[in-house]
From Swiss-Prot:
SUPFAM superfamilies hit by this protein: L21p-like
Annotated organism of origin: Streptococcus pneumoniae (strain P1031)
A GO BP annotation: translation
MF terms in GO: rRNA binding; structural constituent of ribosome
Name of the protein this chain belongs to: Large ribosomal subunit protein bL21
Taxonomic lineage of the native organism: Bacteria, Bacillati, Bacillota, Bacilli, Lactobacillales
C-alpha cells in the first residue's frame, strides 16, 4: 500500500502521494525550488496517523514545477431595461508542485 498524506495549504486540504503533481494556490517560490509543507493533517499507508490537529514532526517535500494562471472565468451582470451591463474576467494564479517525499 502506498503512502499518502493530507496537507493544508492555501486554505484547503489536499491529498498527495509521492510522484504526484498537484495544483495548489499560488506560493511565492521560483520554479525549480523545493518547498516543504509542515501542516500535515494525516499520514496514511501501513500505519495511519491522524493529527490532532496536525501530525507532529511530519513534513511533505515537493519541487515547484511551474507558476501559472487558470482559465479565465467570465462574469456578466445585466440590468434589463436600464442599458446597464458589466463584464469582468478573473484568472486565478496557481503553483504546480511535484511531491518528492513524505516524512512521517
Amino acid at each position: 500500500m502506498s503512502t499518502y498524506a493530507i496537507i493544508k495549504t492555501g486554505g484547503k486540504q489536499v491529498k498527495v502521494e509521492v510522484g504526484q503533481a498537484v495544483y495548489i494556490e499560488k506560493l511565492n517560490v521560483e520554479a525549480g525550488q523545493e518547498v516543504t509543507f509542515n501542516e500535515v493533517v494525516l499520514v496514511g499507508g501501513e500505519n495511519t496517523v491522524v493529527g490532532t490537529p496536525l501530525v507532529a514532526g511530519a513534513t511533505v517535500v515537493g519541487t515547484v514545477e511551474k507558476q501559472g494562471k487558470q482559465k479565465k472565468v467570465v462574469t456578466y451582470k445585466y440590468k434589463p431595461k436600464k442599458g446597464s451591463h458589466r463584464k469582468q474576467g478573473h484568472r486565478q494564479p496557481y503553483t504546480k508542485v511535484v511531491i518528492n517525499a513524505i516524512n512521517a
